[in-house]
From Swiss-Prot:
Entry-linked InterPro entries: Cystine-knot_cytokine (IPR029034), Nerve_growth_factor-like (IPR020408), Nerve_growth_factor-rel (IPR002072), Nerve_growth_factor_CS (IPR019846), Neurotrophin-4 (IPR020432)
Protein function: Target-derived survival factor for peripheral sensory sympathetic neurons. May promote ameloblast differentiation and subsequent reduction in proliferation of ameloblasts.
UniProt organism field: Mus musculus
A GO CC term assigned to this protein in UniProt: endoplasmic reticulum lumen
Xref: PROSITE patterns: NGF_1, NGF_2
This protein's UniProt keywords: Cleavage on pair of basic residues, Disulfide bond, Glycoprotein, Growth factor, Secreted, Signal
An annotated Gene Ontology molecular function: neurotrophin p75 receptor binding
Main location class: secreted
Protein name per Swiss-Prot or TrEMBL: Neurotrophin-4
PANTHER family on file: NERVE GROWTH FACTOR NGF -RELATED (PTHR11589), NEUROTROPHIN-4 (PTHR11589:SF8)
Signal sequence bounds: 1-21
Pro-piece positions: 22-79
Positions bearing carbohydrate: N75
Amino acid sequence: MLPRHSCSLLLFLFLLPSVPMEPHPPSSTLPPFLAPEWDLLSPRVALSRGAPAGPPLLFLLEAGAYGEPAGAPANRSRRGVSETAPASRRGELAVCDAVSGWVTDRRTAVDLRGREVEVLGEVPAAGGSPLRQYFFETRCKAESAGEGGPGVGGGGCRGVDRRHWLSECKAKQSYVRALTADSQGRVGWRWIRIDTACVCTLLSRTGRA
């Protein structure tokens, strides 16, 4: 024989309206190693399902190509800095010639600790097909056959007095975030080095820079 208060509690629970429990939708949050810190991604890195059609907007602004007429070529991903300069600066020459473009087949890179890591070709995305990693790199223009002279990669810088200075055009690297795997198979977002400029290095012929 149950006490009276126990019977009242059972009757109360029985009379409660049944409230349908909605199933919780599965979390769309990616695992920690797959969720990039978006504020740390460089404009030189693109995560997309197809290769970008042109350079990053920030690159166009820095190169002075923003605001060109509508008839200007849209695809400048393989053009050098001198080719994207506005008409008012056509007479100027760069100390070192550079070419920029999207790298679509990068497989390895050097991370912040100087170790070689594998750059993953695909980045899993929630609710869709995976994304690919593209890197907009700037390198020194290679010397073409029969087109020797200053301003190309490995050559002397343009406009430098060779009587007093030894000069060379070299690629400059910067760090960007990318999804990589180390030698032990650990996957994560790491800082890797990519080519971002072509600069002139000088060495005094007297041994003092």
